[in-house]
């Protein structure tokens, strides 16, 4: 039986996008960000598809442990660090590198008893005001870490850019200057996320931390991955399970929100918000059928969507329907659904069959 909803993952696209990043930041090591199940693409799958990555970054200790148990040997930074003593000890046991962003974590770390010094990162709050230590707190933390024999030295430092995708906004320049003052001119630093490494030369430091770029998606509003020279890894697809003829004036779907303004040939595709397709996708959101764009009509249901096939008369039951990916950028669908592509990729649910290909 052919699964109704599937995400076709182009494994060659991972290598292409990684090479693109390497060319964009040739003097930087690459810490590939594969948190949140690799933005919906599969944590272990992504790690194995990126053997040239100098390190990986995950959000949580549990994610790092999964990678170690799968045999992933590269350095693994844990961006949220640890939240208790058990998390700290598990990080040490599995060779993870937690990011230190609070005095609470430092207090725990001072009590760590280990024969092998643990690698950690120190997080500077340069202006995003989420995680990290600023000004005097940062300086004190750096000194405390330098005095800890249980910590591998020297301790690298990172920060996160809040607005790097807005190239005409002064926030990033302010953050870069702030980080420069706190971190000083020497040391192992990581600044640039996807937008940062693309748009800000000063963010291409010893380490860059690309996330969304790895998956072939642009971090910039109004631009798509293919326009940047990237290849989408995920193509979300389903198939037509019904085709029917409607009359002018017929209402479609829950609430009858869409009223046919002409005799309409309607198709039903077996995918909905239960698969991760956005419920807020508006009438007119494009899908691909037989290589042609046709519009979504009516509300998105849990398991199905309705599309107008009037201008695609050759479409028939069983045809593939592409929701985003190859030929239809996920960035465009995100605009129609009033969201961001990160959300769409991360929200693909477990009942969607993941199919690996090499295009």
Curated annotation (Swiss-Prot):
Recorded catalytic activity of this chain's protein: L-alanine = D-alanine
GO terms, biological process: D-alanine biosynthetic process
Keywords assigned by UniProt, alphabetized: Isomerase, Pyridoxal phosphate
GO terms for cellular component: cytosol
Protein name as catalogued: Alanine racemase
Annotated GO MF terms: alanine racemase activity; pyridoxal phosphate binding
Family (UniProt): Belongs to the alanine racemase family.
Gene name for this UniProt entry: alr
UniProt key word tRNA processing: no
EC number: 5.1.1.1
Pfam families from the UniProt entry: Ala_racemase_C, Ala_racemase_N
InterPro entries: Ala_racemase, Ala_racemase/Decarboxylase_C, Ala_racemase_C, Ala_racemase_N, Ala_racemase_pyridoxalP-BS, PLP-binding_barrel
PANTHER family: ALANINE RACEMASE, ALANINE RACEMASE, CATABOLIC-RELATED
Residues recorded with modification N6-(pyridoxal phosphate)lysine: 35
């Amino acid at each position: 039986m052919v699964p109704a909803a599937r995400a076709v993952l182009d494994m060659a696209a991972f290598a292409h996008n990684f090479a693109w990043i390497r060319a964009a930041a040739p003097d930087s090591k690459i810490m590939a960000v594969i948190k949140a199940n690799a933005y919906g693409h599969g944590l272990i799958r992504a790690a194995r598809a990126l053997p040239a990555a100098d390190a990986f970054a995950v959000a949580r200790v549990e994610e790092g442990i999964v990678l170690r148990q799968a045999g992933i040997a590269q350095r693994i930074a844990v961006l949220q660090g640890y939240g208790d003593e058990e998390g700290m000890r598990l990080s040490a046991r599995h060779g993870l590198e937690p990011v230190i962003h609070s005095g609470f974590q430092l207090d725990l770390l001072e009590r760590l008893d280990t024969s092998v010094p643990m690698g950690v990162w120190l997080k500077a709050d340069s202006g995003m005001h989420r995680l990290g230590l600023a000004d005097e707190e940062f300086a004190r933390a750096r000194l405390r870490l330098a005095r800890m024999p249980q910590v591998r030295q020297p301790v690298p430092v990172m920060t996160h850019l809040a607005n790097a995708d807005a190239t005409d906004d002064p926030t990033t320049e302010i953050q870069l200057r702030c980080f420069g003052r706190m971190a000083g001119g020497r040391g192992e630093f990581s600044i640039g996320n996807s937008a940062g490494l693309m748009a800000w030369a000063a963010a291409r430091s010893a380490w860059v931390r690309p996330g969304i770029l790895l998956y072939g998606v642009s971090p910039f509003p109004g631009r798509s991955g293919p326009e940047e020279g990237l290849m989408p890894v995920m193509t979300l697809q389903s198939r037509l399970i019904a085709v029917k003829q409607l009359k002018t004036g017929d209402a479609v779907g829950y609430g009858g929100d869409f009223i046919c303004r002409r005799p309409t040939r309607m198709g039903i595709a077996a995918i909905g918000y239960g698969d991760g397709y956005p419920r807020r996708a508006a009438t007119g959101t494009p899908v691909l059928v037989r290589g042609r764009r046709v519009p979504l009509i009516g509300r998105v249901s849990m398991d199905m969507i309705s599309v107008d096939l009037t201008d695609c008369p050759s479409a028939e039951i069983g045809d593939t329907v592409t929701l985003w990916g190859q030929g239809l950028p996920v960035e465009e669908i995100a605009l129609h659904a009033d969201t961001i592509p990160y959300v769409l990729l991360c929200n693909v649910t477990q009942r969607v069959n993941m199919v690996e290909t090499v295009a």
